[in-house]
C-alpha cells in the first residue's frame, strides 16, 4: 500500500492518486463537542509541504465517496484504502467515545451513503493516544445502533503514538478489537528514525500469536529509506512522494517480491514474510 500523506484538500485526492498512491491519509480535527470538523493538519507539518489545506469534513467525505464509487465520473479504481489520522489531542478520555459515534455517523451518511452504494474504500481509524480507545467502542456501537454493523467489515484500526506494542495490545483488548489491526511506526520527514520498533511490529505480525495484521512506516520520501522499509518487510509506506515509492518497487531487487495492492487484496489479512 502506497499511502499518500496529508491529503486534506479535495484537489489533493486526484493529485496523489495520479502520482501512484493507492491509499491516502487524511487528518481530521475535532471541535470542542467532539464533532469531526474538518480535514486539516495545521502548522507545523512535514518539511516541504503546505500545512494549511483544509476542507469541511462532510464535504471531504462526499468527494472521497465520488472518488471511490465505481461508475462515478471522479472514480479512481486504484484508491482502495483511506487512513483517517484522528487529531484527538484536545479531547478528554470521555469525549473519545463521542468522537467515535460522530465519526461513524458522518461516514455512514456522507461516505457510505447510508449503506446504499457508497464509497468502496477500506477505512483505517488511526488514533494517537491509547487512552482514547473508547473512540473505537463508540464507532462500533454507533454503526450497530444505526443498523449497519456490516460496514465494520470495511473498518480497521491503528494506534499511531509509537507506544510499546504490549500497551497497544492491551488498548485493543479494552476496545474489544480482534483483527483488522494496522500498526504504524514513524516520524515526520524532518527527522530520522530507526527501524527497531517497526521490525518488532513485523515480528509480531509474523508470529503465531501476534495481534497485528499489517505494518506501515511513515513518512518515507527518499529512495534509501524506501529500500530499508521494504527490507524490513512492511505492508505499507506512507509518503509525500508516491512516485518515489513506485520507482523503487520497480527496481530488480523488489519487483519480484512486492506489488502494489489492488481492491482484491484484503487489508485485514496477514501476509507473512
UniProtKB/Swiss-Prot annotation:
SUPFAM superfamilies: PLC-like phosphodiesterases
Gene3D superfamilies: Phosphatidylinositol (PI) phosphodiesterase
Entry binding sites for Mg(2+): 25, 27, 85
Any one GO molecular function term: lyase activity
Keyword line: Cytolysis, Dermonecrotic toxin, Disulfide bond, Hemolysis, Lipid degradation, Lipid metabolism, Lyase, Magnesium, Metal-binding, Secreted, Toxin
Family membership noted in the UniProt record: Belongs to the arthropod phospholipase D family. Class II subfamily.
UniProt protein name: Dermonecrotic toxin LruSicTox-alphaIC2
Organism phylogeny: Eukaryota, Metazoa, Ecdysozoa, Arthropoda, Chelicerata
Amino acid at each position: 500500500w502506497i499511502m499518500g500523506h496529508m491529503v486534506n484538500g479535495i484537489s489533493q485526492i486526484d493529485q496523489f492518486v495520479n502520482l501512484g498512491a493507492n491509499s491516502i491519509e487524511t487528518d481530521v480535527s475535532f471541535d470542542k463537542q467532539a464533532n469531526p470538523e474538518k480535514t486539516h493538519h495545521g502548522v507545523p507539518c512535514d518539511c516541504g509541504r503546505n500545512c494549511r489545506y483544509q476542507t469541511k469534513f462532510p464535504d471531504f467525505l462526499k468527494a472521497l465517496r465520488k472518488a471511490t464509487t465505481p461508475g462515478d465520473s471522479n472514480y479512481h479504481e486504484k484508491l482502495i484504502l483511506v487512513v483517517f489520522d484522528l487529531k484527538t489531542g484536545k479531547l478528554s478520555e470521555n469525549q473519545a467515545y463521542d468522537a467515535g459515534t460522530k465519526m461513524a455517523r458522518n461516514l455512514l451518511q456522507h461516505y457510505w451513503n447510508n449503506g446504499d452504494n457508497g464509497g468502496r474504500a477500506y477505512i483505517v481509524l488511526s488514533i494517537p493516544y491509547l487512552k482514547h480507545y473508547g473512540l473505537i467502542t463508540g464507532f462500533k456501537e454507533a454503526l450497530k445502533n444505526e443498523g449497519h454493523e456490516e460496514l465494520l467489515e470495511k473498518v480497521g484500526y491503528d494506534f499511531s503514538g509509537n507506544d510499546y506494542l504490549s500497551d497497544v495490545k492491551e488498548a485493543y483488548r479494552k476496545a474489544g478489537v480482534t483483527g483488522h489491526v494496522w500498526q504504524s511506526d514513524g516520524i515526520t520527514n524532518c527527522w530520522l528514525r530507526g527501524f527497531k520498533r517497526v521490525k518488532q511490529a513485523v515480528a509480531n505480525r509474523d508470529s503465531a500469536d501476534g495481534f497485528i495484521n499489517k505494518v506501515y512506516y511513515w513518512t518515507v520520501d527518499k529512495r534509501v529509506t524506501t529500500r530499508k522499509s521494504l527490507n524490513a518487510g512492511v505492508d505499507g509506506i506512507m509518503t509525500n512522494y508516491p512516485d518515489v515509492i513506485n520507482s523503487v518497487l520497480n527496481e530488480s531487487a523488489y519487483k519480484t517480491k512486492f506489488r502494489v495492492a489492488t481492491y482484491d487484496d484484503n487489508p485485514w489479512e496477514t501476509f507473512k514474510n
